[in-house]
Amino acid sequence: MKPVEMARLEATVVGRVQGVGYRYYVISHATRLGLTGWVANEQHGGVQCVVEGSRPDLEHLLDLLRDGPASAIVEHVAEQWMPYTGRWGSFSIRSSGHSGD
């Protein structure tokens, strides 16, 4: 049996994604998938996510990020894959305007 690849996904979501429950949508799905990391609103109106876990679960979350909740309009999701760090033990919503990890 092949071991599951662990990874880190950094994603920036652009569109009508603030004030529509997008961060709560992300935390709900990330928690259900057993992922760790955080999500935050950005000053320019987008949403940033830094998430760690198994590559298949992260790819599933990425598909969900592209869909968003019914009230959102997702125009673009920029993604960057990084090595897994194991830095977080849970998933959280960070305050608006947070930058860095």
Where are these regions (language model features)?
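Intrinsically disordered, low-complexity, mixed-charge
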Residues: M1-D101
